[in-house]
Amino acid sequence: YISLRTALNSDEVLAVAYEYTYNGKTYQVGEFSTDGINAPNALILKLLKGTATSPQTALWDLMMKNIYYLGGNQIQSEKFKLNIQYKNDSSGVYVNYINEGAIKNQLLIRVMNLDRLDSRNEQSPDGKFDFVENYTIYSSSGRLIFPVVEPFGSHLRKMLNNEALADKYC
């Protein structure tokens, strides 16, 4: 994935050209400026972020929705705690579970696959965030990684296993 150190302004776009090898064959996406493109000809690139960012745009499905900046860097495991909460519509209280569907009363941190290990890194959830470098967190850059692609969308929808509830919570 690509992560920028500073956010783009709303009127700025991000596009790339790249080359990769698959099964011994080299492929190119877009054109490099060294390909002999001269002004005023257009340089063809792959758009990563346009000026409009909403679920209705074609780019929405290509965006990473599972990596979140925590607002700091050099995160230390012994000082870091994570809790995922949802504001209950009827009570107005923040809770760390959804009280309906196939995930009824399960901690959201567990539902999101962020609690699968105990303090000895054995397969036994303990109700605490699994601080696993390069899997659930990039501590040096302060990024939280959900190990599912769309944690609050398609993943939660699948876990709820009920279309009406999924429409309510996702």
Predicted segments with their positions:
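Surface-exposed, low-hydrophobicity segments enriched in Gly/Pro/acidic/Ser residues
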Residues: Y1-C170
